[in-house]
Amino acid sequence: MKKQILLTAALLSATSMMAQKLTYPQAPKDGTIDTYFGVQVADPYRPLENDSSKATAEWVAAENKVTQEYLSRIPFRGKLLNRMKELANYEKVSAPSYIKSIGKWLFYKNDGLQNQSVLYIMDSLGDEKNARVFLNPNQLSTDGTVALKGIYFSHNGKYAAYAISRSGSDWQEFYIIDVKTGKLLDDHITWAKFSGASWQGDGFYYSAYDAPQKGLEFSNVNSIQKIYYHKIGTPQSEDVLFYQNPANPMRFYAVSVNEEETMMFLHESGAGSGNNVYVRDLRQPNSQFIQMTSNLDLQYSLVETIGDKMYFLTNDGAPKNRLMVTDLKHPGFSEWKTLVPESKDMLEGVTFVDDKMILNYMKDASSHAYVYSMDGKQLSEIKLPTLGSAGFYGEKDRKEVFYSFSSFTVPTTIYQYDLNTANSKVYAAPKVKFKESDYVCEQVFYPSKDGTKIPLFITYKKGLKRNGKNPVFLYGYGGFNVPLTPYFSSVRIPFIENGGIYAQASLRGGSEYGEEWHIAGTKMQKQNVFDDFISAGEWLIENKYTSKDYLAIVGGSNGGLLVGACMTQRPDLFKVCIPQVGVMDMLRYHKFTIGWNWAPDYGTSEDSKEMFDYLHGYSPLHNLRPGTKYPATLVTTADHDDRVVPAHSFKFAATLQAVNAANTPTLIRIDTKAGHGSGKPLSKQLEEQADIYGFILYNMGLKY
């Protein structure tokens, strides 16, 4: 009886907290008005774009205080976080990768709750017990906010260059390890961005920008990317400028050299996902780059080189991709030969292994894989465990094949595949503290507003009743040729085991069905994406999975835009909205860091009157209306996000707090020493997810 009374008292206290109207900090404002094609558009919270100003810093601190006080009073938040930690505390291992130049195997492992995964090295397969730590990113900072972005071994096996990022920023720094001694050398490269390291001799090529002005490191437009060559043992100030193209400042450039160091490739990409490729024969003294392709709207991905042959995955003439081959004597695209033609499914990747090829296709947003001969004939299918996502690993001159497999209820498992017997065996299986067989995952196809069938994955616990009272976490993205496929995340389990439903929609704008599917969700067809997502919510309600009182929508980055647009267009449909690191100001997004790179998907407010009108018509920031009742909203961003600058979320949250006519919380959670999401330490991830799921359940009147 006493326990019941205490529980009732706790619920009454929680209900009282929900009824209290929150008081929000006053955001800095000015009278800024922009004019687009004769149309005046006010931007009163423009001062929040200055993320290094004292006024912005004070507002951020005050907003975080309101948010943290609210979240800390959710009675079950601690219990939820503890369960998330329990579920995340399992050993996670990557597929092993053979490094030919050193004759050893590398793999990543996380013992459970380590903030960053550790890189291990072993002499041979099966020798995992004697594996040695090669690089432990957890030792690079006390709080786990320094992340390893990549490691690159020299072709002579003497050195390894590794890239790190700090606090989630896209800026990279390179350091060098002497492989034989394990000693860290004095070499240090700064202001690299969107860069790997490609070795030639005792040095490597990398891509960087000029050092930004102090105070604008995380907001200034990135232009004129340059390629440098760094010689080991020399200071960065002596690095040789290898390539730049000031005539096209808004392009990315990178160099790659094959492992035999016989070919060099220059990769050029503009705004969007297309690219051009140039090749140079390093065996010929004073040779120059030869242009292979000339269409920045299409993709040409170099997959492998074998002798003088070059293999490319491309959507040129094949919206769902095809595999093509050419050689140094016939580099121009018009002379390329189709090795594997386009099929009805999306070709995602090709792995060369032991005189064979493994082609990984996507069918209805799930992986299907096949073994091919080198002359392009299909030999067999690789049987995968269930609907899910697979990634393949192998080397052209070795027999070993590994693949990772994951689905909504299947934690990432590593398999070793035998090409001779066509059998898979488990190489590394995680042990998560939940019972996989207790859950159901189904895929349905629902009609969008225009009748297009959209794939929707729905995951829930067995025995769930479709009575319209189940909480739903509806997730989407819909853009930039990025597919949403099945994957495991332990933080969802507490929600699902408590009677929740996780729903994931594969919206237009992604690559689930090729380039046509992508284009159907871009520029002046972007509304299709929002219609797809809104229709998913309506379908779930119509089919009694949930109701408006239990429907939450969540999305990050372009998915944050998705949530922002849908909640402004249909505020009546959702109970809770979580726009994460979203693009909220569609009129000014291209004026920050690499926002210009998104123009092929979005268009810009300067393109034309028609494009401005279209963007203005759905831009989340510009479609918040005074007097409208909006759902409970938790906006998330981070102080070091230099991909989608936090000003988007700052201005959106400040405006929503000012106009919302409903007595619903409008909070913004601003993470510190964090960025767009990549490299975020596990401890920060779990804290954030406990806040998000706690906020959702609490504002639905539910508990955990």
Where are these regions (language model features)?
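Hydrophobic beta-strand positions that form the internal "hydrophobic ladder"
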Residues: W105, G157-A160, F204-Y205, M264, ...
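Cap/lid segment of the alpha/beta-hydrolase catalytic domain
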Residues: N138-I151, A163-S169, K183, Y417-N423, ...
